[in-house]
Curated annotation (Swiss-Prot):
The lineage of its organism: Eukaryota, Viridiplantae, Streptophyta, Embryophyta, Tracheophyta. Disulfide bonds: none annotated. It is a single-pass membrane protein. Pfam families: PsbL (PF02419). Signal peptide: none annotated. This is Photosystem II reaction center protein L. The chain crosses the membrane at residues 19-39.
Length: 40
């Protein structure tokens, strides 16, 4: 937390990485739901 002031770019990279992981998780969940819908 203390390094966020000295290096704000690092914090932005972490934020983008977190949003990317959430996006991939959302796509994965939607893919599973759609596959279950089509197979059933």
């Amino acid at each position: 937390m203390t390094q966020s002031k000295s290096n704000p770019n690092e914090q932005n990279v972490e934020l983008n990485r977190t949003s990317l992981y959430w996006g991939l998780l959302l796509i994965f969940v939607l893919a599973v739901l759609f596959s279950n819908y089509f197979f059933n």
